[in-house]
């Protein structure tokens, strides 16, 4: 059984080093540790050249979505049985992979339990209501169980078997960032009981209180609505309900015109502009890198 792990990175060399170090310490042996370098300009290229135990793939910046798509493609085509996906600002505990693989007979797609650096569990990224285009929070009660069923996952620690990749393909690089893992996990859940493993712990760099307002992220969240709608049509045979579309339009208009009044003026303007541009580019059905 061959287990491949890959990390997608872009201009976060100091964090990448920490992630790689945590993977080198895994109690379950990794057959191939790979880095997808999304065109970093912070010295990552030179540092990675010196690492003898890594497989490195350099490419232009195709966003997280393009990086994860390339990583899954590489691992699958190279014969991996299990593929573990990792971002460059998360640090799995030493037994994380071992804990995931304890349940490999139960599920062919398993999710690590993500925690903020201050010890609070991450409640998002595990359950998605496609009919409402709504991501539900996970309650703390779920963590009383060794594992529990979810219907989507996050590329921060998702472990997937090649048989599922054969059925659903590679992650969709058109998203560039955000929603790519949500839709990929949702597709996987149609073919296996996707579970979150409580003791497969993965720690994030950020704390729970570090809420960051990102024009970049917000743009793609709004722009990618049309791609999520495309998935809804493919899976259910129908587009998002009219109510969902109206809520999206109202949210875009509100946040681009009067939203984020609590932010300082410069950031507030950037957030509003990004959301408006994301809304317009959604109507134009733009894909890949557009911001």
Annotate each PLM feature.
Residues 95-125:
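Conserved donor NDP-sugar-binding/catalytic core segment of glycosyltransferases
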Residues 18, 193-213:
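Active-site donor/metal-binding and catalytic loop motifs
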Residues 22, 37-46, 90:
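A conserved acidic beta->alpha catalytic loop
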Residues 152-153, 157-160, 164-169, 174-199:
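A short, conserved alpha-helix in the catalytic core of glycosyltransferases
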Residues 80-89:
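Short beta-strand-to-loop acidic/aromatic patch adjacent to the donor-nucleotide binding site
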Residues 48-74:
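Conserved donor nucleotide-binding strand/loop of the catalytic core
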Residues 216-224, 235-291:
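Non-catalytic, C-terminal membrane-associated alpha-helical segments of glycosyltransferases
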Residues 21-30:
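Short, acidic, metal-binding catalytic loop of nucleotide-sugar glycosyltransferases
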């Amino acid at each position: 059984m061959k287990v491949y792990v890959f990390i997608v990175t872009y201009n976060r060399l100091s964090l990448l080093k920490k992630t790689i170090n945590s993977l080198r310490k895994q109690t379950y042996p990794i057959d191939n540790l790979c880095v997808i370098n999304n065109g970093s300009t912070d010295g990552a290229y030179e540092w990675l050249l010196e690492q003898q135990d890594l497989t490195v793939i350099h490419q232009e910046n195709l966003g997280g979505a393009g990086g994860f798509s390339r990583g899954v493609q590489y691992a699958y085509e190279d014969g991996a049985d299990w593929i573990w996906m990792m971002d460059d600002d998360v640090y799995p505990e030493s037994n994380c992979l071992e804990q995931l693989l304890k349940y490999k007979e139960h599920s062919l797609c398993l999710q690590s339990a993500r925690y903020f650096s201050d010890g609070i569990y991450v409640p998002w990224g595990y359950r998605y209501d496609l009919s409402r285009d709504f991501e539900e929070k996970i309650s703390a009660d779920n963590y009383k169980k060794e594992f529990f069923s979810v219907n989507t996952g996050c590329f921060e620690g998702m472990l997937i078997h090649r048989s599922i990749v054969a059925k659903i393909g590679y992650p969709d690089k058109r998203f560039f960032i955000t929603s790519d893992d949500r839709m990929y996990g949702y597709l996987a859940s149609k073919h296996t009981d996707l579970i979150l493993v409580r003791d497969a712990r993965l720690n994030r760099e950020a704390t729970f209180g570090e809420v960051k307002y990102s024009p970049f992220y917000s743009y793609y969240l709004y722009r990618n609505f049309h791609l999520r709608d495309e998935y809804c049509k493919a899976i259910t045979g129908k587009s998002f309900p009219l109510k969902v579309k109206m809520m999206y339009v109202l949210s875009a208009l509100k946040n681009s015109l009067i939203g984020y009044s609590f932010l300082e003026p410069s950031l507030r303007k950037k957030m509003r502009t990004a959301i408006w541009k994301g809304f317009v580019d959604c109507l134009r059905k733009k894909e890949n890198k557009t911001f």
